[in-house]
């Protein structure tokens, strides 16, 4: 089993004609035998990253190396072999076949890999016993609790003993007793040389992680001094899909606010002049920037943290910012 290395990963997709990058320049190194938690709210790129690691989604650029093999370059039979033998995925919705029993669900990847029916059933029974479902193996998913279904999904994911396990929100929709069962099982999976990557927004899972990766940075609200930025015409202040912690107010010149489109073009949203501000929504809600901003002419802008913006410019609560209320005079 090997190490996992993610190098300058960029994932881009299109929504409503606009280009979005939920993952933009991610770098991450994970040693074999590690349990990694991807922490962040919905929409921050956790599931997108798991899809790339699983060979389901191809990134725009960058590399994902597992055991020294760049999986972003795999195609055809090599990619199919990676998906079947190198990675196991535990989906948030379990993805169990309703008409099959627990043991039959676990047998699916084994049979697909060419194992005989007798051997695959024996292996499936061993796995279900390992996750404490020996007495429920002949029950269909509809007769199992949420926690039991999740354990069947885990047993299926490790059926071919893959060195990489990916789990997407494994504690979603489970009660506290079921959560405890799943947490213990996931921790056991990372023992040895296997790499386990878990996407979650559940902070209860963090203590058992070897490493926590915050996909949405937790910017601290501070009263640090405003940052003045001078740009020449054509220079970019920030790019669409990047993260930031400053709200900008134009003091001189003009800035273009543009959406990057799926066809590589741009859509002008607004020209901001002296007294205008922009970039507040992403900062307030810890979202990626929704547009690219560049100087239309030689221009100057001042960047404020949320707290400094409220205090120094007379803006009160979130509603004032979201409704883009006019700024008070200094």
UniProtKB/Swiss-Prot annotation:
**SUPFAM superfamilies recorded:** cAMP-binding domain-like (SSF51206), P-loop containing nucleoside triphosphate hydrolases (SSF52540)
User: Where's the Isoglutamyl lysine isopeptide (Lys-Gln) (interchain with Q-Cter in protein Pup) crosslink?
Assistant: 65
Q: Chaperone among the record's keywords?
A: no
Q: Tell me the domain of life.
A: Bacteria
Entry keywords, A to Z: ATP-binding, Isopeptide bond, Nucleotide-binding, Transport, Ubl conjugation
CC terms in the record's Gene Ontology section = plasma membrane
MF term (GO), any: ATP binding
Member of which family?
Belongs to the ABC transporter superfamily.
Q: How does the record describe its quaternary structure?
A: The complex is composed of two ATP-binding proteins (Rv0073), two transmembrane proteins (Rv0072) and a solute-binding protein.
Q: Could you tell me what this protein does? A: Probably part of an ABC transporter complex. Probably responsible for energy coupling to the transport system.
What is the name of the protein in this document?
Uncharacterized ABC transporter ATP-binding protein Rv0073
């Amino acid at each position: 089993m090997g190490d996992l290395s993610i190098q300058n990963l960029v994932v881009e997709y299109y929504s409503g004609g606009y280009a979005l990058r939920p993952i933009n320049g991610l770098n991450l190194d994970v040693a074999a035998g590690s349990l990694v938690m991807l922490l962040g709210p919905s929409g921050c790129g956790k599931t997108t990253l798991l899809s790339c690691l699983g060979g389901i989604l191809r990134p725009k650029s960058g590399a994902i190396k597992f055991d020294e093999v760049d999986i972003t370059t795999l195609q055809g039979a090599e990619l199919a072999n990676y998906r079947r033998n190198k990675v196991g995925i535990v989906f948030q919705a379990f993805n169990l076949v309703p008409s099959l029993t627990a043991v039959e669900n676990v047998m699916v990847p084994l049979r697909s890999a060419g194992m005989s029916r007798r051997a695959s059933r024996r292996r499936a029974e061993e796995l279900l016993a390992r996750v404490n479902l020996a007495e429920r193996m002949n029950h269909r998913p509809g007769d199992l609790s949420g926690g039991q279904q999740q354990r069947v999904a885990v047993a299926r994911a490790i059926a071919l003993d893959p060195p990489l396990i990916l789990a997407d929100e494994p504690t979603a929709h489970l009660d506290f007793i079921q959560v405890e069962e799943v947490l213990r099982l996931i921790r056991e999976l990372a023992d040895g040389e296997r790499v386990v990557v878990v996407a979650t927004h559940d902070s209860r899972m963090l203590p058992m992680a070897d490493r926590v990766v915050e996909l949405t940075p937790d910017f601290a609200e501070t009263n640090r001094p405003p940052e003045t930025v001078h740009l020449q015409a054509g220079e970019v202040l920030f790019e669409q899909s990047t993260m930031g912690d400053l709200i900008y107010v134009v003091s001189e010149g003009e800035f273009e606010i543009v959406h990057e489109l799926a066809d590589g073009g741009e859509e002008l949203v607004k020209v901001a002049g002296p007294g205008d501000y922009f970039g507040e929504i992403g900062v307030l809600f810890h979202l990626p920037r929704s547009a690219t901003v560049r100087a239309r002419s030689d221009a100057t802008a001042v960047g404020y943290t949320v707290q400094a913006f409220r205090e120094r410019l007379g803006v009160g609560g979130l509603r004032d910012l979201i409704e883009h209320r006019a700024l008070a005079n200094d």
